[in-house]
Amino acid sequence: MSKDKALLRINQLKEQLNLWSKQYYVDDNPSVDDTEYDLALKELISLETLYPELITSDSPSQKVGGMVSEKFLKITHKTPMLSLGNVFSFDEFLDFNTQISKISNTLDNQYVAELKIDGLSISLVYENGSLVSAATRGNGVVGEDVTINARTIKSIPLKISKKERVEVRGEIYLSKAEFEKINQKRLLNNEDLFINPRNAAAGTLRQLDSKIVASRNLDAFLYYYISDDSNNLTQYQSILKLNELGFKTNKETMLCKNLDEIKAYIDKYTNLKNDLDYQIDGIVFKINDKNLQNSLGFTSKIPKWAIAYKFPAEIKQTKLLDIFATVGRTGKITYNAKLEPVFLMGAKISAATLNNAEYIKTKDLRINSIVKIKKAGDVIPEVIEAIKDEDFYKLEKFKPALYCPNCHSLLEKNENEVDQFCINSSCSMKILRSLQHFSSREAMNIVSLGDRSLEILFNLKIIQNISDIYKLEEYKDQILAIDNFGLKSYLNLIDSINMSKNNSLEKVLFGLGIRHIGSKTAKILARKYQNIDNLMSASYDELIQINSIGESLALSIIDWFKIEDNLKLIDELKSFNINFNYLGAKINSDSIIANKSFVITGTLTRPREEFKTLIENNAGKVIGSISKQTDYLLAGNNVGSKLEKAKKLGVKIIDEQQFFDLLKSEKG
């Protein structure tokens, strides 16, 4: 593949992986299974290996994972909460063990085997025997402060006997039984149902009301111990130490002394995983010997002494009862499968996504055929293929829909696109989905206006367009008359709506639903133009000069602001005092480091994210690897091979003080 084609594909993969990552870690609403994510990440890494000069610091290959919400205070982890490498078969685990043996000089390495709980990672810090902080993983460097909520979890002790500073890490989760109870209650209250236990656990831990957290019976398994004596203990002894201090650990954890025991452990829980009362998505194997752990060390992303074995996707056969279409906020038509119910990964499955008509044609899926479905992780199941037996060919071939399933307008399909679209601006389902998008967490974050509540208000004609959201106080009596919608719910709704008025420009820009503008592009445009009026005045030629803004996106922006109804909406939102200014740091385009590229290496006195932010706020960019095109290597202590490579290529090397001096100097 040529470098230009590789760059194009890398950018596509980065955007897709970052979106999937955000959906999983921030929105708690994954849209793809782990297998699809891992394959895309693998493709990205292979392309970046081929062209290392194309690696950037925002690449998913360089990230620990997750992102930090804006709802809680932030806590910087003293030791970064890293991700884990993955293997997908026992053979791949053997390859991992072979790499370990190059340091340990034996293939019989001892591992601690832990079930990989599908929950939310947590870091607990104790000082003088008291719990002083609890933080989520966040982006691995900075997490969310959830101390008040963590205190309500019965399996997290508020006091321990050890007086020295202790950090304990583990996983917050919700049992399957508690998950069912919560969803039953939400169903009775006309609230949106949680997708899965992980989604429910994450949503609960991020509640602002700790009483709600306490009522949902979150649980925790702890597995990682950091203190003054932790280096003197093996990994398994650390688990025993946690038990001794009163922490709940997983009783299924086992010290495996050889490869046979590891294989037996994998086989056992591959078969038993659905019988547990909590969800797991794999097994984590950690080297037991701490000295060997220290010798193996870390990459910037993962420990070299631990690996996650991921269970293969579960596949079952069932009958495809029907294929039906739905319409989204942009008018895009999505096809779905109605299935004969079947149990898969402990859940009853009766539907699956089929994406678009081209997907169905390619797989030649037919109504009443027997199909294979798979489910890896906790997302919507996927139809893999039809069983093409003798009966299959007697069935009628699939025919794409001609009309919108909601408003019955004729569908359109561009020659170069696989998707069909409803272009009727009055389509009620498009309008409802647009409203739900506007109020979503990633957009305006109107937390008390969930999809179900919005649908009820939409059907009652109380909300028919975006500006109606900000008129709800006029409908107080009508809203209070709705079943299960009391005064407290109403007041929370009004508070959420009023809070949304103070969002930064990128939030409302994303919420408006301009085609091709995702959350990342909205942030780029907001930082560039600072307010909505400047963006409205931008020309096509000006827009396409912005990095990552292509022709179709530039045209989409220009066309959107030409529509009279859209301009009227902006004016109405301004009349409700919606903020249309960018509230983030302003980019200093006149900085001496504008358009300069930096690679950061070694241990610094401040978090790397802080240096990255400083560079980006001064119009510079941070990349992942050294090349001839790199302008500066910012080097801390304990630097690795990047320093030698920079010297060899003649890249300017600076330390922290020189970096700050550079920022203070004027452009010549």
Curated annotation (Swiss-Prot):
It catalyses: NAD(+) + (deoxyribonucleotide)n-3'-hydroxyl + 5'-phospho-(deoxyribonucleotide)m = (deoxyribonucleotide)n+m + AMP + beta-nicotinamide D-nucleotide. NAD(+) binds at D34, T35, E36, Y37, D38, S83, L84, E114, R137, E171, K286, K310. Zn(2+) binds at C404, C407, C422, C427. Its cofactor is Mg(2+); Mn(2+). One of its GO terms (biological process) is DNA repair. Its EC number is 6.5.1.2. Keywords: DNA damage, DNA repair, DNA replication, Ligase, Magnesium, Manganese, Metal-binding, NAD, Zinc. Residues 588-668 form the BRCT domain. PANTHER family: CHROMOSOME TRANSMISSION FIDELITY FACTOR 18, DNA LIGASE. Belongs to the NAD-dependent DNA ligase family. LigA subfamily. This is DNA ligase. It comes from Mycoplasma mycoides subsp. mycoides SC (strain CCUG 32753 / NCTC 10114 / PG1).
